[in-house]
Amino acid sequence: MQIIEITEPKQTDFQQKLQIAVGIDFGTTNSLIAIATNRKVKIIKSIGDKELIPTTIDFINEDLIIGNNKGLHSIKRLFGKTLKEILNTTTLFSLVKDYLDINSSELKLNFANKKMRIAEIAAEVFIYLKNQAEKQLKNNITKAVITVPAHFNDAARGEIMLAAKIAGFEVLRLIAEPTAAAYAYGLNKNQTGRYLVYDLGGGTFDVSILNIQEGIFQVIATNGDNMLGGDDIDVVITQYLCNKFDLPHSIETLQLAKKAKEILTYKESFNNDIISINKQTLEQLISPLVERTINITQECLEQSGNPNIDGVILVGGTTRIPLIKDELYKAFKIDILSDIDPDKAVVCGAALQAENLITQHTNSLLIDVVPLSLGIELYGGIVEKIITRNTPIPIAVIKEFTTYADNQTGIQFHILQGEREMAADCRSLARFELKGLPPMKAGNIRVEVTFAIDADGILSVSAYEKISNISHNIEIKPNHGINKTEIETMLKNAYKNAKIDYTTRLLQEAVIETEALMSSIERSIIKLTKLLSESEISIINALLDNIKDAVQTRDQILIKNSIKEFKSKIKKYLDTKLNINDLRKCKNSNQIK
């Protein structure tokens, strides 16, 4: 993200007093809500004087109970997921198996005596947070800045925004959790340099590389895994306790595991009447999970060109485990920053940003980055990347495209996400068609396509044909989610297949260019039959047949050689009798079928 300077109209003192905005960290394990006043952050406490509110929802005696660590939990992992994904993912299915409505065509849970969507259930948590804030602040709260994992896709972002809207919030901004944490450190510490944000929460792991210079935050790279967090560490410890002490797999054993984990962050051993476990055993159990986070961090550094890192910012309660600090220092030999409570860093950043957006304390805005490239399918299945990976947002990019065939009155647009060169290897986001175009020769139509991503990471695509003034707009809301593991896999596949993809693209471009050449020549022969003798037509047709045979082989060198032979043998016709302007247009334009 990058802070950019924007001057807004000045507000009166009265208007400023009326406006209150909160920051919300909707976590997998715990949620927090806070408000900033004059850049000082206050965490809103719940009933029982708790700042960390468990993100759980229970239904008891016709009442919804938030934060009792029973009932539905880890709801955040379900944002942006389809029923099919839930059924095919063991970890996700285990979260909702007791509530899942498998007869529904979409993801719904049987909860609180009715069928509810994930956004409706999550809204209850937002309502609870809102009510607690209004009680303490004695004011109506309607505006909020909400944090999300860096790799939340459009579907997940849209669902969390819907949940907040149902709860009565106007979402001023969605910002990435690592971004919010870095923002909190940037304003409080005035750090300058390149920093790694290591965010290991209850259910997700995010890592970001940030360049911080005098209040300017620039994201260099992001990576992560939304199926890895403190919850997974709890499961490993629980499994050990069950096997070692013959305990049942129950909520009580899980709570015991969590308590042991917390105690061992500052003591060498934990003992009670039921179990006994020491710090060394804990570290042996969780070492593979910690190593996974180190590997993901290393990949993120490599993607950003291995810059010199000035420090590591720790975020998430799980980072209190001493092994994590030890392994980070061992791997990267850099200072670990943890001055701000890792459980509160994200919500502090969100609250500070919320204050920024409603007051004149600063003109700064936070900007995130695009996790995967976004593009459009060209004729032949080639992908034209419009917005590349790690581009700061908000962003708008305009590119011009044209038609492939003569008298083409419609263009089909296929929006894609990914790093591969061919559409078949990328993720399909949406399709739409621009109809009613004026019938013209291939290459003469000009269509402006705009890809725009707003500050919340929502993509919209518009197409505008200049001659007829026909336009079409679409907001991209993918019908299924993509988690950070899938993003990591897509990136690995892109790197692994880079050479093959590039060769495939060059071949396909050669085929398209050749087909355009043959089409142009064949049209010219028909128009100019009176200017060409039968023998000349026979020579040209024979050479065209050679090109067609070369195309069938899918051999790029053979195709190029056949075109070279064609041009050399009929050079005199190219310049005098055959019109190949269409070919030049096709070669230099982005064509869409």
UniProtKB/Swiss-Prot annotation:
InterPro entries attached to this UniProt entry: ATPase_NBD, Heat_shock_70_CS, HSP70_C_sf, HSP70_peptide-bd_sf, Hsp_70_fam, ISC_FeS_clus_asmbl_HscA
A Pfam cross-reference name: HSP70
Domain of life of the source: Bacteria
Annotated gene: hscA
Protein name listed in UniProt: Chaperone protein HscA homolog
PANTHER family documented for this protein: HEAT SHOCK PROTEIN 70KDA
The organism of origin for this protein: Rickettsia prowazekii (strain Madrid E)
Family statement drawn from the similarity comment of this UniProt entry: Belongs to the heat shock protein 70 family.
Lineage per the UniProt record: Bacteria, Pseudomonadati, Pseudomonadota, Alphaproteobacteria, Rickettsiales
Gene Ontology terms describing biological process: iron-sulfur cluster assembly
Keyword DNA repair assigned: no
Molecular functions (GO terms): ATP binding; ATP hydrolysis activity; ATP-dependent protein folding chaperone; unfolded protein binding
Keywords: ATP-binding, Chaperone, Nucleotide-binding
NCBIfam families: PRK01433.1 (NF002399)
Role this protein plays: Chaperone involved in the maturation of iron-sulfur cluster-containing proteins. Has a low intrinsic ATPase activity which is markedly stimulated by HscB.
Parts of the chain that traverse the membrane: none
Transmembrane found in the keyword field: no
